[in-house]
Amino acid sequence: MEMEEGASGVGEKIKIGVCVMEKKVFSAPMGEILDRLQSFGEFEILHFGDKVILEDPIESWPICDCLIAFHSSGYPLEKAQAYAALRKPFLVNELDPQYLLHDRRKVYEHLEMYGIPVPRYACVNRKVPNQDLHYFVEEEDFVEVHGERFWKPFVEKPVNGDDHSIMIYYPSSAGGGMKELFRKIGNRSSEFHPDVRRVRREGSYIYEEFMATGGTDVKVYTVGPEYAHAEARKSPVVDGVVMRNTDGKEVRYPVLLTPAEKQMAREVCIAFRQAVCGFDLLRSEGCSYVCDVNGWSFVKNSYKYYDDAACVLRKMCLDAKAPHLSSTLPPTLPWKVNEPVQSNEGLTRQGSGIIGTFGQSEELRCVIAVVRHGDRTPKQKVKLKVTEEKLLNLMLKYNGGKPRAETKLKSAVQLQDLLDATRMLVPRTRPGRESDSDAEDLEHAEKLRQVKAVLEEGGHFSGIYRKVQLKPLKWVKIPKSDGDGEEERPVEALMVLKYGGVLTHAGRKQAEELGRYFRNNMYPGEGTGLLRLHSTYRHDLKIYSSDEGRVQMSAAAFAKGLLDLEGQLTPILVSLVSKDSSMLDGLDNASIEMEAAKARLNEIVTSGTKMIDDDQVSSEDFPWMTDGAGLPPNAHELLRELVKLTKNVTEQVRLLAMDEDENLTEPYDIIPPYDQAKALGKTNIDSDRIASGLPCGSEGFLLMFARWIKLARDLYNERKDRFDITQIPDVYDSCKYDLLHNSHLDLKGLDELFKVAQLLADGVIPNEYGINPQQKLKIGSKIARRLMGKILIDLRNTREEALSVAELKESQEQVLSLSASQREDRNSQPKLFINSDELRRPGTGDKDEDDDKETKYRLDPKYANVKTPERHVRTRLYFTSESHIHSLMNVLRYCNLDESLLGEESLICQNALERLCKTKELDYMSYIVLRLFENTEVSLEDPKRFRIELTFSRGADLSPLRNNDDEAETLLREHTLPIMGPERLQEVGSCLSLETMEKMVRPFAMPAEDFPPASTPVGFSGYFSKSAAVLERLVNLFHNYKNSSSNGRS
């Protein structure tokens, strides 16, 4: 027999038939691997060619011992099956199961049959296009298949595996729209369609749950069941722009699979009987899922992979056709015999630090930033009692007919219903021209008109910034319709309409610019270090946002600048930003203390005197220690001036509103098309509106007047001669907005009003969070308690991971030594895959690491093109509102005043305390940054091993507007203020240890044990568990031909 002759070493070589379309055969990866196989000298490669495959009968096809055959466009799979049945070669990839790969339904069914995790999904099968199916329901924000509901965002895939037109539909709360994913065309792999809301109906589709993966996809490539190579790439979901290197190739980076993922790779390979097989992996919330199986796939541009694949395929073919031959690899791989040995030098450490450094030994380990949202429109609220039948019926329609239940209207359908009802109730007269003598009726009609104007604003609806509450107040008993007894019916309800507070075009630009600044200045690597870290999974990034739309969009715009993304914000928001309302929203925990502070503040402002306790320290040395610090001494006089100037501006806007043509909003039945830019915040200045003398954005003069008249009325009640100082921040907010965005309206006295409002707001706003340091600390700790606890968890986890790396290095050296000695005694190739059960032993740091509930993956450091391969940087970004910024800052600056910490020095130096006292406002995009550095030169037990650097920025800078120069003119033209750079909160050269930081703020932070428990997926033993990490390195870095791999190209 031929193979017996081959076994003696003098017969024919093992013939490997390549029955593949020429386009695939002559691809670079296939050529690299086949050339390596042939260089072993044991194989003869037979290329069938397109003519033979397509035209010749199978009987005349070359006879081979091993067959490489896989389906591609135009490939006659049936012929290949007939040939295999006739000649019975060893099949590298089985042919029969390749039919499964053409139907995504069968792929998912097969994966589930083998217990391989897949996303939650459901199938919609149509026999003809546009067929109505009783089990399929579509609503505005979800689809339902056989009773199973999929909320947006969800994914829609054609069941045809060769159709790559995949859609992702986004919820209305994020602006709606659809993103289409497709095979790469040039530099694009997806496109966003903001107007598409309804799903496709022309065929059969799979609907599956969208999984947030941090904007990165993982591609896994198996070569037999015991080898898997994984790469990361930027997900097309984010912005659809393909990242390419200088050679024009898509940028991909090797990553290490977890033990569970390695087992999944093995099972995919076995389940589909495809030795060479590529599949897509989704990593989401600590779990991994297979979402697509592609069949025959090779890695591109990885010489390490080409080496591995050739070695594994060689062993497979020898085991199948010559099992008595040794499959031990030669000491030097044949294709590396003539290559020079390359040096491993050049991986040097890079020092980092804004405030001083420990030299070349210091490494940045963690960046934590708490950021306020960007520039927004003024927040508005309209309250009115309604008795109109149409509005009461509307309330009953959406609260289930319950007479005492309130209802919230947010969706487009609900708001359209309200608009229709309101249009029929609003008098057709213009503001300021009413003849009605009843003041209450006049005010009611004015508020109804305001509600109508708000609902018509922009010509669309978006729950992200407009919502209405209807709460019943009075009821009467009426006979039931069937005459059987009585029932309650509401006759009066309170309507509360909240609107405004939308991120402006300027706010979006500010956030994106700040993200770009962080990328270039907060991380080592000359501006590109962060992007390399992120792409290689060595940048552990999480972005959190409160529930408010302006905060979410600020986070998305910041991420766009930070990661150098392109495209619309909605896909970035859904892919990268996690909402955490309990941590970043709300003031409920401190509402009692804040009311007390406001009452005391009102007393100080309206009485005209400052109240300083006798036992307080000298206000000259520590001015921030006095009650009401920062309030102007003549606050009472300024308050009356504020009222007068506010009335003056309001009257000017009233005259503009009187001249506004109401016909702009008619005819009522025509609604302009949906505009995502307006729903989520304008992306650009509407130059035409401004040129025609209209207010910036979509606000008309009627709404502008409503904004100012409400401020004037609420600020001062003439009948009771009573001031409401809580309106001062709102007056300042409105004034600042119009000064920046509506300067072209030339409102007389606006500049003067702004100066007075700023003086008062600079004193009032900080004191609303506590009238003195002790109260500021108490209120701050209640508002920011959960956020402070999360920050401590972030810092602690980073420290534990860094310490594990240091300990791991010693283990690696021992493993290297052991591996080398054991390799000398081996007579056969060791497994390239280690059973996952061996990798699931828990590590010592698991419990601590699980507290954070965050997924952690490891980079294959050997192939990372970075200066310091061991560097792993954790970034946590928390986007929130002004209240949380003030609260966190107050905890940091006053924590040493707590009784439990008496005698401790402040975390913030005296110089910084003085600057903070003068920094009255933490404006839009203000931020606090904590950076954690590790000094690897000191011992692991030394407190100086980890130091914290604290910086802050007061955000948008108004000062340039005071100058009548070119810069001021440009800022006014662009409506965008610059963001102040970071300022130090510690002395240069000082060292705030992590240990000290934890001790000082722990009393004001939520304990780690109070956070929800983390769920660890089966087989995932933590980020740096020692046993798993060491074996993981062994699998990926130390093959039995390691002694020659240093010659390889990478």
Curated annotation (Swiss-Prot):
Region of interest (Disordered), residue spans: 817-855
GO molecular function terms attached to this record: 5-diphosphoinositol pentakisphosphate 1-kinase activity; ATP binding; diphosphoinositol pentakisphosphate kinase activity; inositol hexakisphosphate 1-kinase activity; inositol hexakisphosphate kinase activity
GO biological process, one term: positive regulation of antifungal innate immune response
Name of the protein this chain belongs to: Inositol hexakisphosphate and diphosphoinositol-pentakisphosphate kinase VIP1
Signal peptide: none
Taxonomy of the source species: Eukaryota, Viridiplantae, Streptophyta, Embryophyta, Tracheophyta
Highest rank taxon of the organism: Eukaryota
Phosphoserine sites (modified residues): 821
Species name: Arabidopsis thaliana
Gene3D superfamilies in the record: 3.40.50.11950, ATP-grasp fold, B domain, Phosphoglycerate mutase-like
UniProt feature, compositional bias: Basic and acidic residues: 837-846
